[in-house]
Amino acid sequence: LFRSPVSVIVPTFRERENLPGLAERLGRLRDRCGLELEVLVLDDDSRDGTEAWVRAEAPDFVRLLIRTEGSLEPGSDEARIQRLGGRPRGLSPAVIDGLSMARHEVLVVMDADLSHPPEKIPSLVLALEAGQQMVIGSRYVPGGSTDDDWGFFRWLNSKVATALARPFTDAKDPMSGFFALRRSDFERARELNPVGYKVGLELIVKCSLENVGEVPIHFTDRVLGQSKLTLKEQLAYLRHLRRLYMFRYATWSSFVQFALVGASGVVVNLTFVTLFALAGSPEWLALLSGILTSIVSNFALNWRFTFPDARMRGTRGVLQQFAGFVGASSVGASLQYGLALLLVRSFPALPLQVAALAGIAAGMVVNYAINRYFVFKTKHPPRPKKRGV
């Protein structure tokens, strides 16, 4: 039925109980559809019997890639079992390894816990062959569904995560871990560095996949094993989103972060002014403490978060950038004061607060431009990370 052979990538960690059922269903699918199939199990060194199962019971189309953080002993590979050393743990890095090492042109990613129906793989493949760049097994298109015992907060969590990803894709379920794409599109990816579980969204952004289709599926809650979706993973998703925003919308993302840091500086300023005033300090000292602490706070946050690729290391480098930051802040403050004063004198009916806001906006833009293009100028852009082994 299909022109292209298929590689199925299955990332695992302590999923031994689910693998026989998954392999059985994939085997039936292969026989029924005449599908040329390989299954790559990417295991994060579970030591739960997965290796013994592959060696003794798994069908011949299953290959096991054991990922470890440490180095490997020479000659540790077998015919169907390969060990990969120096690998960070995690679902997303495992998927990237699997996509890189797969043999076939059509690549399918799915979970091992049987929440994704293998019987939908033909629909994904046919949609790819019809011209889609990526096809997602979706819970949220017409015909898609989840088990009835999904609680409100789980549903809300999924919807919020999807809404936060909307600037990158119109797909209804970009969070899905069940999707297919071509090797040729995967190999166009730039700077792959996913965090957490949402590797599909990473590929949509980094492979520039604009033609994304969706096939309805019923998402089944796992019966065996334990869910890996924890609060830690949800926080990792937020970090991942930040990276993607910085990748796709670099200038606007860094400007928004710069503005947020500036807003936090106002809070720091007022806090220290209040504390010093309550301690009985003279007004000039209270005001000075607020200014100095907010400058240091703003610099530290911008150095750490807004311009991470351009920060200098070592005491001398940090002090050099701090001096530049203070200089840029002085230029911005001077512009803010001058413009506000000019507006007040030129338009006497203009409220003072409006003039002040105009000055703040102009000062912030100039301050940001000086910091980005001079103080935190990136001389050597980071090289894209290599994929593969």
How should these model regions be labeled?
Residues 1-4, 192-267, 277, 302-330, ...:
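Hydrophobic helical membrane-anchoring modules
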Residues 4-6, 27-40, 60-63:
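Short loop->beta transition adjacent to catalytic acidic/histidine clusters or analogous donor-positioning motifs
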Residues 15-30:
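Short, well-formed alpha-helical segments that are part of the catalytic scaffolds
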Residues 17-21, 46-56, 74-77:
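Acidic helix N-cap motif at the loop->helix transition within catalytic regions
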Residues 43-51, 69-71, 114:
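A conserved acidic beta->alpha catalytic loop
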Residues 72-101, 118-197, 222-227, 232, ...:
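Acceptor/aglycone-binding surface of glycosyltransferases and processive sugar-polymer synthases
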Residues 104, 112-115:
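Short acidic donor-binding/metal-coordinating loop in glycosyltransferase active sites
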Residues 107:
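Short aromatic/hydrophobic "clamp" motif used to bind/position activated sugar donors
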